[in-house]
Amino acid sequence: MNISNYYWHFPGALTPKFCDDVIAYANQQEEVMARTGGYGDRKLKKEEIKDLKRKRNSDLVWLNDTWIYKELHPYVHEANARAGWNFDWERSESCQFTKYKHNQYYDWHCDSWDKPYEKEGPDFGKIRKLSMTCQLTDGSEYTGGELEFDFRNYDPHMRDEAKHLRRAKEILPKGSIIVFPSFVWHRVKPVTSGTRYSLVVWHLGKPFK
């Protein structure tokens, strides 16, 4: 799919109080090891954990609170319109509160899959269309942890990776939001000091026609 805007940003959109409230609330909840889609919810073997952490190493908490969605949804609607995507979406998945501590990261990935959700429930038959990442800590509170995008869509003629990477510096101020199509490739580089807290939400709809 060809698009003119690969992401839309809102610098410092969320108030410091909201960010701090989410951090405090999430830190009271049960923390789990971050996974990628292929591992599901089953108990992992040591070798599987080792293999997983080559791709993704972070800790997270799942949140489903109305007060969080109420704050975030207006930005999803605005970005969807202003960026010119105009994707039809119906509902949001659970919010993923992520902690990136020293040497933690998430290598190159996209948030969508080649098939819609097959498990019975409200997500059945839907795909991830829009992704949102919210910066809960200020960029001055940690080093490393850069959010980067790859806009090549894996065109074989675009072999010089450096020319097609975009480091999203717009995310650095506390409370900033970036919304992007879920098929866009991105990564979070290793944090070298401090802790980066983020909130990620995926917004679902019927497959593109």
Where are these regions (language model features)?
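Fe(II)/2-oxoglutarate oxygenase catalytic core
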Residues: M1-V179, F183-K209
